[in-house]
């Protein structure tokens, strides 16, 4: 449809629609960088300081960089400090290095820089050219170049007047310290006239000035004695520095500025004050729409400091009002919420502190520490750019075995590009290895210790043994000696006592000796350790004693563990995580830490505490549970995992039970068999007893013997029966079991495969074990006598497919599951105590993707914008904002208007609504219906308010708000849906049909829709207006049919109607019928089925409709609100009852008349039928009576004469008549007429009916309106009493905004003051739109001049979403606010240059009027040379130029043009001239002035010459003198002066005009004789056209495309200098057809274009369009044909050049080479050339036949140059006079062509003039034709004979016309053709007239 086609053609948004994308674009944008050029002392540093302070960029200067490094007290700073302290200067190389490092710093990467000292005059380390190349190659290249211009004289005077304070180091200018200058400034200010002030105000102002002057003089007196002049400020030093600058840097800097984009080159007048320079730069930056660096603002309140324990909600609510931008514009919450963005970038989720909260891009960010705050403040971009905020992905997954942990972990890892750490596979093996290593080391250490102990013991034993042997030997020797001596000296009696005493002494001595010897031995042993050790045997780990020592150690080695095993496990886990985090290939921008998921982590509390100590806690703990199904799914998976083992145990148990049962059954069987045997034996015995009576005693004895045997304890009979019954029952059940059960038999042990270990998920498709029947063969117990071949059939118990068998074998698994749950509950409390987020997910009936979605949502929820219900605090904030706004807005007119609306409406109007405005977003998304939300059900999301239709809708939005808001484009609005209401007869159907046609939507008439539904079945319409007629017609039809049948008459078909079918209506149809007939409301069920098709089903759903006549009742309106079928608006047509009477009553009366007429006709027809029937019946009865009489006579048998019974017959006739009258009496209708309703009564009755219906409908409409007001449906009232086309127009105008502004139906704009708008931009609270200060509305209307903001034309800022738009006036503001989407869907504004216009013309031509009009409407500077001179003298009186001007003026001389142009050039550097533009009035007027302007490169975009005749000039002068007031001095407006000026102007203007037309093609002549409005429109049209050319050129060049250079003031010299490889030949023609088309024949640039810095000229518009579309195809390297060298290019020769080539002869002996080649080199194609068409190619001369042939050769010389003549040439042609030819030849050479044309025309026309022969007629026609088309005849002659020829043809056509119109019979004049008489008279008048002269 049309709407869809329109959507496809929509232009993309100028500004990014998505707010997050806008912030991302801002973060990715390059910061604005400045560089300032200028002479030393021009003020670069001061200007840089001011710009850096205002623009928030970093000032990169040597001094500031050095001070920063020294203050940092780092290594570089210490080195710099030492150099300075030692008195050395810092090397230039080091300074340059530090500056470059500063430029590459993160701070500069965000804020940008402003550079002033590169390039520098220092050439030792690096030349100026190298410095410039260094600046050009910077990563952040300068965007804005500022050039401060100042003359050498002015700069030297200013610099040498500077003084420095000896203590503070502050530099003062002469204006600040010189008392004389201060005094002169005071005098000038005092002499300045003060207007509009009272005497008291003047006195107060003078007193204040006097006090300020005294204070300033005191300050000067204090500092004057401390001021010194620096050596560099001496005049001679300044002059040397300036000279050095001009020699070394100026030329190179000029080249840099010439290469730079002129739009971003700002030139300043250095004579202005620093404040003026700064304001000029700021205005220029504002005009250029340069992005300002986004500032970071620390949010800290003046109240008590907040603690970190404060709630997050309270924190944000409190901090958002710190440093408030304005009421209602608080700081927003970011995606990071309270998380620290710097820590999050590192992979740690730390909560930010309240004291470290900052604002950036309008949002709040909480930093966690002073260090993170510092990093964020330097450059927040790396921490905020996508993919941030992103959860670091530190996850622990817990859960029972086989619940799906591995699957979920892998899915999470895949989603977050992370790695899974399986604790059992990666950590536990390492821990086991470490433990084994510990055991091994312990055993090794114990072994070494044991070996040393054994070695030491063996050594000690050996030493002791040796010592003992030595001691024993010594004792033996001593003892033998002493014994021998004692034996000799003493007697035998004293021997025992001596022995005892000697033994004691000897033992004492021996002890002392042993002690001394042992000491000696030890000392000796220490000296001889090596020899001793070598002497003992070698001890190894296999030594028995060593093994005995290690036996206990080896016994406890397996139980050996670390002292803190959990710490060791945590340490290993830390190592694994670190290895995982070292993975650099995760994804770009990934956090430093994180990216891991741990599974199978032990549920050990001590291990978790170790993780806390190691700071290894995860961000999220996921626990997978199966609580919902009570572990059913987990047990199912565990069973499947261990199916073979469990099934085996189940089968084993079942087989044992079956065997036990079998054994029991066998025992019972044996007992029964024994009983049967005994019974049989007893029976046999009894039989024997009866047979043998002799042996009774013996039998009794035998029986008694048998009965006395010890029998087993048999069961009683009942028990036996039960056993037998149970056996039979079991056998029957066994027989009922089919042979093939649900499952398959259990495979044999050899075929069973073991299930691999590990936590792997079972496959989704598997056969439940309950469906499996297992048959097992078991051998019967031989003890029980069972055969080995008997088979026992055992089946596994059945269970659900997703369940498990409830058997005792599952109890261990259940126990394991219960133990896991208990362990988790114990660990869960520990986890929660450490504030780690825990997510418990039930896996029941959930897919892995659903589990992943749940986990991802939980992980990402902290980093998404959250929505919350509007609470009391929000309403309090809104009330505070409203109160603050009321206090601020005092004088606003809008405020006065709003006060009339009421406070609630004002609050609603100012409330910042969400992406669906006041409509419910949930209903919009789900039902595509615009349902107004309930303000009580409000939610705040991203600082915007959303209304909802119900609590359920609000809950949906709170759960997933991002699903219901716009993302990259506005939400699509449903089509227009309108309910049109009005009383019957108000014209709503006509209006609805017209509106539907205009808007392209459906028109639905509700009553007609119901009638159509009924017509399908009942084939008739229902309603009061249809019921009466139909019933009456049926009755009449029935009566007519009966009468016709009686009368035997056939009634015409058109008098009757088709018999309606008798149908059975459904309940729905009965309800519709009742609604139509009795005007009852329809039931809700029927309304729902009908309306849902229009609101919810295609094609009406997406097209829209106008619902005519619905709702009809309040109940139906209430149903619309309850069901959610909301129209956009309800249009109610208001009319009075009289209007209804005037419209409907005439038709009703006419209908009544028609009805009455038909009724009378029916009555007449019925009457006639009844009369005919009566007559037939009377005639029949009469015949019967006569027959009776005749019969009676015959019965009497008497015959009488006629005379006899005439009287009797007469009486009998009377009797018959009487009888007929009695039987057929006359109808009462015939006797008396029925009383019929008269017209007046009918009219009154109809009027009353209409009035009652109107009143009823009006009341219903009022009730409906009340219902619509309740559900907030807009009501549009339209006065329907006016003419219908006016009502339609009014209705169309009221509904048109709903259609035209449909795409902006959800958009809301908020106007703000200009001050607030700029404040928001400075804080980067809102973004400047791509339109900058362009008016989007005017831009869409074709405006090319940017509006300017001043006191007279203030801009109107408007906030739309996250951008600020500046509108030029209130009208455009209203347009934009009504449909902002329309105006932001347009191309971005093209780059503009300041408009520079000159207007020249004679005096009184209107130059100044046009110039002032341009200045007032567009803000241009209106400048004349006099204004420039006066501005120079007033603003810079001490400058060199002002001194020179005063020198000339004081001598009474005129200012020389050179000085005037210099003053004009300085004036053109003003801010307005460089931003908006300038219009120069009345300049230049002499060629010299023109040359000076050209030398200064002052080239206007366009020059307007107002051409006014001299007579008009003096006429305007006289009118001006009549109206002007008399002045005290004479004016230069006398007629003589004006005449002199006019003459002087006309004398010089031609030369000036020719110069600009030739050089710049920018001269436009305007006819000034017209009105000033006509002149203004013409000037404006030309300016707009020129602006479009320039803007298009700049846009295409910036995009790297080809652009047309027409009307760009390019001089021929510049064109030649920048021509491309093809010079002035068309590259398109050369590429496509290999033709050389020289475009230098014309100087026009209409078909010229620029591409890659070169100019190319094309031959036509078509070629230009091709080149502009694909320029790469026509220039190298893709160009197919290069341009030949100059010596191979053809050159056209003039006659003089041709003569100069003599005696060189022409090629081909002068024959035309083109004609010869095109003629296929035939003999007839040898045509001599004409010397006027000569050319030179390849140093050869060729002569062509004509200009056309010459151009052919010039285009394709290769085709024609190399030809050879044939041997036979045609003879030379001699000239013959035409008159010497014979007549046929003469005619052939002279008039053949014209004569042939005339004869062909005569042959086609076949003329025949009336009353002339054919021959004479043809001759006359040929003669007239020759005269009319004679090329040598005069224009007058040709026109004359053309008229005669046309008259001749018309007269010839008279014969054809009259022959076709005339008839043989006479026709009266009124029956003839209109022109017949005139043409006939003309025909007859030609009889005697000369056809040539007549």
Swiss-Prot record:
Which residues are listed for AMP 3 binding in this entry? 1430, 1482-1485, 1489
Q: Where is this region: Adenylate kinase 1?
A: 32-286
The residues that hold ATP 2 are 985-990
GO cellular component terms attached to this protein's record: cytosol; microtubule cytoskeleton; motile cilium; nuclear membrane; nucleoplasm
Q: Which residues form a coiled coil?
A: 451-478, 651-691
**Sequence ranges of Acidic residues compositional bias:** 198-211, 715-736, 876-903, 1223-1241
Q: Which residues bind ATP 1?
A: 41-46
Residue spans of biased composition, Basic and acidic residues class: 757-768, 777-789
Question: Region NMP 3: which residues?
Answer: 1424-1455
Assigned keywords, A-Z: ATP-binding, Cell projection, Cilium, Coiled coil, Cytoplasm, Flagellum, Kinase, Nucleotide metabolism, Nucleotide-binding, Nucleus, Transferase
According to the record, the residues making up region (NMP 1) are 61-90
Q: Main EC class of this protein?
A: transferase
Name of the featured protein = Adenylate kinase 9
Q: Which organism is it from?
A: Mus musculus
In the UniProt record, the gene name given for this protein reads Ak9
